[in-house]
């Protein structure tokens, strides 16, 4: 039996730079993994079975099942395994839990089979599974471009404390992206300040310029997200939405007021750090 830990991520910032003819959007985003995980248990089994603590997700629709199936197709090696995913990362929160699960299992399978697939083939599989999956093959701190799959991994990571509010609502990424119009597109030249600050690894300097244009749409679509965001603003924090939502994050530690509000509102408060 093997136990794997599958990390969450945060989009520290996200800018939309273009809309492609195929309907997808070109983005510029800053990915960073968190010290916060799902747990995955893998053991030998008579046949492939993927189970999760969310029984409403059918096996064939589970991204981990799809990842294993693609690995089988690329290698010709049948995987008779039972995979049990214990979810801790909120679903639909913009923290990449499912994508991380898929990448973690892909890395495990490739290592188990003596790195049968070169890195570029693993990335090829990851891109087929979803825009965030390639990032999780390595994790750490990275710039994501294209639809998020064109990655520049930075040599160092940040380690600041961070807290996250999950307002107990799932944000639908497709719905959020469908509301993007030309008025919120960012000229890539305007991101030069971000590129220069990244190399200083100073989150406080970077934070002053970080935006999430997609998150602004999520705030308009989901009153629950806006309520958490506005509350943190009221307390003097600089909250940001992660990805397309629904999680709202703040660099630093939560105050007693945040702890109390989370308990009253039924929000999930996650205290972690960049890793």
From Swiss-Prot:
UniProt GO molecular function: 4-(cytidine 5'-diphospho)-2-C-methyl-D-erythritol kinase activity; ATP binding
A Pfam entry, by short name: GHMP_kinases_N
Q: Which UniProt keywords apply?
A: ATP-binding, Isoprene biosynthesis, Kinase, Nucleotide-binding, Transferase
Q: Where would one find coiled-coil regions in this protein?
A: none
Q: Which reaction does it catalyse?
A: 4-CDP-2-C-methyl-D-erythritol + ATP = 4-CDP-2-C-methyl-D-erythritol 2-phosphate + ADP + H(+)
Enzyme class of the recorded protein, top EC level: transferase
Q: What is its EC number?
A: 2.7.1.148
Q: In which pathway does it act?
A: Isoprenoid biosynthesis; isopentenyl diphosphate biosynthesis via DXP pathway; isopentenyl diphosphate from 1-deoxy-D-xylulose 5-phosphate: step 3/6
Could you name the active-site residues? 9, 132
Name the positions where ATP binds.
90-100
Instruction: Tell me the Gene3D superfamilies matching this sequence.
Output: 3.30.230.10, GHMP kinase, C-terminal domain
Gene Ontology biological process terms in this record = isopentenyl diphosphate biosynthetic process, methylerythritol 4-phosphate pathway; terpenoid biosynthetic process
Function field: Catalyzes the phosphorylation of the position 2 hydroxy group of 4-diphosphocytidyl-2C-methyl-D-erythritol.
- Entry-linked HAMAP family: IspE (MF_00061)
Regarding protein family, the annotation reads: Belongs to the GHMP kinase family. IspE subfamily.
Q: What protein is this chain from?
A: 4-diphosphocytidyl-2-C-methyl-D-erythritol kinase
Q: Which organism is it from?
A: Sulfurihydrogenibium sp. (strain YO3AOP1)
Lineage runs:
Bacteria, Pseudomonadati, Aquificota, Aquificia, Aquificales
């Amino acid at each position: 039996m093997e136990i794997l830990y599958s990390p969450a991520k945060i989009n520290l910032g996200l800018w939309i730079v273009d809309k492609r003819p195929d309907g997808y959007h070109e983005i510029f985003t800053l990915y960073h993994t968190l010290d916060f995980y799902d747990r995955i248990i893998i053991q030998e089994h008579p046949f492939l079975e993927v189970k999760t603590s969310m029984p409403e997700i059918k096996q064939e629709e589970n991204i981990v099942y799809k990842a294993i199936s693609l690995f089988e197709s690329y290698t010709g090696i049948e995987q008779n395994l039972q995979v049990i995913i214990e979810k801790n990362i909120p679903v639909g929160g913009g923290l990449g839990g499912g994508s991380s699960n898929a990448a973690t299992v892909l890395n495990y399978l490739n290592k188990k089979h003596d790195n049968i697939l070169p890195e570029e083939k693993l990335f090829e599989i990851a891109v087929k599974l979803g825009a965030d999956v390639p990032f999780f093959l390595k994790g750490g701190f990275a710039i994501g471009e294209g639809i998020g799959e064109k990655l520049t991994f930075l040599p160092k990571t940040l380690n600041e404390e961070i807290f996250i509010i999950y307002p107990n609502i799932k944000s639908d990424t497709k719905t959020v992206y469908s509301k993007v119009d030309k008025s919120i597109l960012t000229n890539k030249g305007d991101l030069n300040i971000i590129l220069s600050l990244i190399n200083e690894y100073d989150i406080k300097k970077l934070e002053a310029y970080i935006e999430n244009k997609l998150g602004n749409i999520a705030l308009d679509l989901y009153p629950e997200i806006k309520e958490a965001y506005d509350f943190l603003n009221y307390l003097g924090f600089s909250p940001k939405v992660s990805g397309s939502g629904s999680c709202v994050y703040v660099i630093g530690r939560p105050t007693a007021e945040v702890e109390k509000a989370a308990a009253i509102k039924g929000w999930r408060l996650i205290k972690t750090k960049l890793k």
